[in-house]
Amino acid sequence: MEELSQALAGSFSVSQDLNSTAAPHPRLSQYKSKYSSLEQSERRRQLLELQKLKRLDYVNHARRLAEDDWTGMESEEEEEKKDDEEMDVDTGKELPKRYANQLMLSEWLIDVPSDLGQEWIVVVCPVGKRSLIVASQGLTSAYTKSGYCVNTFPSLLPGGNRRNSTTEKDYTILDCIYSEVNQTYYVLDVMCWRGHPFYDCQTDFRFYWLHSKLPEEEGLGEKTKRNPFKFVGLKNFPCTPESLCKVLSMDFPFEVDGLLFYHKQTHYSPGSTPLVGWLRPYMVSDVLGVAVPACPLTTKPEYAGYQLQQIIEHKKSKKEGIMGKLTPRASENGHYELEHLSTPKLKSPPQRPNHPESLMEN
């Protein structure tokens, strides 16, 4: 373990995607790069300022997603690409699909914000896969974060089935985590509700709206013929030390994958952003410096050390690519952030009951 820690200190960046949550946390062995921390903190400040100036046409954007109508998008895409460069938002790998890169993804929470207790909200996330849900024109479609439609079904979401889709403008767009085990879409965030876009609304308002409106849709949390998958809202909590300790001691109706930390003022911006942070529960004590209770969620798993090995292997393959010796294996690792889950699978999983094989694609 000591050798791995020393090797890790050689450099911080594990990928082309800064602090991607698909790779292991850079501070698992108490390693911390001052430059990286300052950079993440500074990028947060800049993004909060720039989002005040950047006002996109989210009404048309939501309509295009709902109606699958992309007429005249070529010129707008060029303009958006320039805006993303100015905003320092990583929209990920370019894919020939209109529904790709529509979700707001997180970075590993490396720099502890000075206003964590006042300006941040935490959401406990289940094991599952991130899904873009579009309910429109009497059907509900589920897309992966790469833009592939993996399922189409009726639902009791506004616009999600022929009975409740009264007008063409009655559509809904949600950011969800799909649990195959529970046959449930856990609703993480809302981008559009009944044709009203919420992209440029602050996180605390989006969450308030979401948890006010979801219970109003009768039968949405039940599995029926008209609603074959349950839709359940994920609760959010304050980020004070007392609140975090209470959250980590709770029992949840699902297998917990990790914690998403949202800045209250951030707008919903597709692509990865430092205004949303990701931690596994057992990292809270080391990274945030919070005294946590001894419970299953805070117990360090046996694969924690393996994550360090993944960092070293990924650094090695990346270095080979830079040197012009990119092997097929290294090339595969080069897309680590897009293809792997929040915690890598073990080649030989540790002998531990109920070890999560498939964690959230975050």
UniProtKB/Swiss-Prot annotation:
Q: Name one GO cellular component term.
A: plasma membrane
Q: Bias category Basic and acidic residues: which stretches?
A: 332-342
Where is the IBB domain positioned along the sequence?
11-73
| High-level lineage | Eukaryota, Metazoa, Chordata, Craniata, Vertebrata
Using the UniProt annotation, give all residue ranges assigned to the region (Necessary for interaction with XPO1): 1-160
Gene name of the record: SNUPN
Q: Which Pfam families does the entry link to? A: Snurportin1 (PF11538), SPN1_m3Gcap_bd (PF21974)
Polar residues: bias regions: 12-22
User: Which positions form S-S bridges?
Assistant: none
Q: Which GO terms describe its biological process?
A: cytoskeleton organization; protein complex oligomerization; protein import into nucleus; protein tetramerization; RNA import into nucleus; snRNA import into nucleus
Instruction: Give the residue ranges for region: Disordered.
Output: 1-40, 69-90, 319-362
Q: Where is this region: Necessary for interaction with KPNB1 and m3G-cap U1 and U5 snRNP import receptor activity?
A: 1-65
Q: Quaternary structure?
A: Component of an import snRNP complex composed of KPNB1, SNUPN, SMN1 and ZNF259. Component of a nuclear export receptor complex composed of KPNB1, Ran, SNUPN and XPO1. Found in a trimeric export complex with SNUPN, Ran and XPO1. Interacts (via IBB domain) with KPNB1; the interaction is direct. Interacts with DDX20, IPO7, SMN1, SNRPB and XPO1. Interacts directly with XPO1. Its interaction with XPO1 and binding to m3G-cap U snRNPs appears to be mutually exclusive. Can form homomers.
Q: Which family does it belong to?
A: Belongs to the snurportin family.
Query: Which residues carry the site feature described as Interaction with m3G-cap structure?
Result: 106, 145, 278
The name this protein goes by in its record: Snurportin-1
Compositionally biased residues, Acidic residues = 69-89
Q: Which organism is it from?
A: Bos taurus
Q: Where do the record's region annotations for Necessary for binding to the m3G-cap structure lie?
A: 210-330
